[in-house]
Curated annotation (Swiss-Prot):
Organism listed in the record: Candida albicans (strain SC5314 / ATCC MYA-2876) (Yeast)
Protein name per Swiss-Prot or TrEMBL: Pre-mRNA-splicing factor PRP46
Keyword list, A-Z: Cytoplasm, mRNA processing, mRNA splicing, Nucleus, Repeat, Spliceosome, WD repeat
Lineage per the UniProt record: Eukaryota, Fungi, Dikarya, Ascomycota, Saccharomycotina
One GO BP: mRNA splicing, via spliceosome
Oligomer and partners: Associated with the spliceosome.
SUPFAM superfamilies: WD40 repeat-like
A single Gene Ontology CC term: catalytic step 2 spliceosome
Disulfide bridge map: none
Length: 389
């Protein structure tokens, strides 16, 4: 590992001397509000009229009655059929304004959508292969993307009138596709991981690769970051979770409780906990900072003869308001759990628009009001779910 003096100074010590000023949130709100002006200037994309807006009914399986049964069931409100020209594996919501979101697809494009009416506002091109990961900065008007083309790209969404487009930086170093990215909440530092099994740490301004975190032996599938130690958590197809010590550039804790590959991991937005889901349909809940196992739910609640080894969990999302955990499966199944108790509240099947071979749910996110859930699918569609709260 080679570390430049500048990047080493950035990462060797997470202390007050390198933290941003306390008005970071105000600055972030200012920067993101400017995106509204950016959207208002954009003409409607010619592709917008080609999106087939469909509404389907969720095929629901009633969960057993329990004390924490939801006040209202989640229902499919809208389907954006043909939202992309290939599978959609990445989604990110602007958490500051809650007004727009972005999706990335096998068609190598990134699309920006208006959340209020789900209209297409812009299409970003530059990647030459499919998009696997997206991340929106809360501190700058930047969008970061990672793709099968082994590259990371930074997009300045305020440079809409530039002849060169709004891509302002690219980061090269990965030897395979980039499947997950994450931004440090306080520093201008980007984390990326993917097929080459290495977590790479970047100074987003200088594009310097500040350090590499080694240890995983298979694809890295998720990266979560936090203000507090451990500041970086990663999951992998090798079935492990690693909590990293950035000061020492090494694994602080290795979690090996999963028996199958881990496809998704998600930190709770308000609690010092996180969850991980594997290809056997098992979801495990962990307590930070020591990584203690708090709860197990998913197929672990079923008897052995009910287990289905094909129950691959591709995506997890946590509702910031209702504390509901969503899990999306490779065969199109959906499940909603009480995050605190682990009890199953609702399950169902999302019907595929292109046959069972393309029924997978690949990515998901709740909006900041907790009233909407966005899911991305193998059949090229985006779906919006809601409740009657």
């Amino acid at each position: 590992m080679s570390v430049t003096a500048t990047s080493h100074d950035i990462l060797k010590s997470i202390d007050d001397s390198i933290l941003p000023p306390e008005d970071t949130l105000s600055e972030a709100m200012y920067n993101n509000v400017k995106l509204d002006h950016y959207f208002n200037k954009l003409p409607k994309s010619s592709e917008e009229n080609n999106i087939n807006d469909q509404t389907n009914q969720l095929i629901v399986s009633a969960a057993p009655e329990s004390e924490d049964s939801p006040a209202a069931e989640w229902k499919l409100l809208r389907t954006l059929a043909g939202a992309h020209q290939g599978w959609i594996r990445a989604i990110a919501l602007d958490e500051i304004t809650n007004k727009w979101y972005v999706t990335g697809s096998a068609d190598s494009t990134i699309k920006i959508w208006d959340f209020e009416n789900n209209s297409l506002k812009a299409v970003l091109t530059g990647h030459v292969l499919g998009i696997r990961s997206l991340c929106i900065s809360k501190r700058h008007p930047y969008l970061f993307s990672g793709g099968e083309d082994k590259s990371l790209r930074c997009w300045d969404l305020e440079r809409s009138n530039s002849d060169a487009g709004c891509q302002i930086r690219s980061y090269h170093g990965h030897l395979g596709g980039v499947y997950s990215i994450g931004l440090h909440p306080e520093l201008d530092v980007l984390f990326s991981g993917g097929k080459d099994c290495v977590v790479r740490v970047w100074d987003i301004r200088s594009r310097v690769e500040a350090m590499t975190l080694l240890g995983h032996t298979n694809d890295i599938t998720s990266i979560e970051t936090d203000y507090n130690d451990p500041q970086v958590i990663t999951s992998s197809m090798d079935g492990t979770i690693r909590l990293w010590d950035l000061r020492k550039s090494k694994t602080e804790l290795l979690i090996t409780n999963h028996s199958k590959s881990i496809r998704s991991m998600k930190s709770h937005p308000k609690e010092a906990t996180f969850v991980s889901g594997d290809s056997n349909g098992e979801i495990k809940q962990w307590l930070l900072p020591k990584g203690e196992l708090l709860n197990e739910f998913g197929t672990s609640q079923l008897s052995p003869n009910q287990r289905d080894n094909s129950r691959i969990i591709n995506t997890l999302a946590i509702n910031p308001v209702t504390n509901t955990l969503f899990s999306g499966y490779d065969d199109g199944k959906l499940e909603f759990y009480n995050y605190t108790t682990g009890n199953l509240q609702q399950s169902g099947q999302s019907p595929s628009l292109a046959g069972p071979e393309q029924s997978a749910i690949y990515a998901s996110t709740f909006d900041m009001s907790g009233l909407r859930l966005l899911t991305c699918h193998g059949d090229k569609s985006i779906r919006i779910w809601g409740t009657s709260y």
